[in-house]
Amino acid sequence: MVSAQARCAAGLQIRVTVSILGHWLIGYFAHNQGRRDWDVPGAAVQGHNVRWCALLTMGESWHNNHHAFPGSARIGLEPGQWDPGWWVLQLLHRAGVVSDLKLPDSLPARADLKRLNRYCSDA
């Protein structure tokens, strides 16, 4: 029989491993390949939106959107862009735990930001 402490330790290791792998996944794929709907002139690296890992990464895979609007609490900006991180933030906001959530419309306008594509749900 496995002790509760051993199960807790194993669960912690699994959670940390999945979190680190998700971070590396975004670091590689979302900076190298995927759809780009925005261009940020002068940026050292452009982000890409990687649809297939949106749920695994809590929405962080909408990285091109993040590079376009880094101060936004919501990263899945278009219809069909699942953003579980935003869903959690909304629940926390309703519970009074977080406040002052910023969205692209409430951020200062960026004159250098250029829209490349309009989002298409089958892309």
Which positions does each model-derived feature cover?
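Hydrophobic transmembrane alpha-helical segments that form the core helix bundle
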Residues: 1-58, 87, 91-94, 98-123
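Interfacial helix-loop-helix junctions of multi-pass membrane proteins
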Residues: 33-34, 69-74
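Surface-exposed beta-strand edges and their flanking turn/coil or helix-capping segments
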Residues: 70, 78, 114-116
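Basic, amphipathic juxtamembrane/active-site segments
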Residues: 72-92
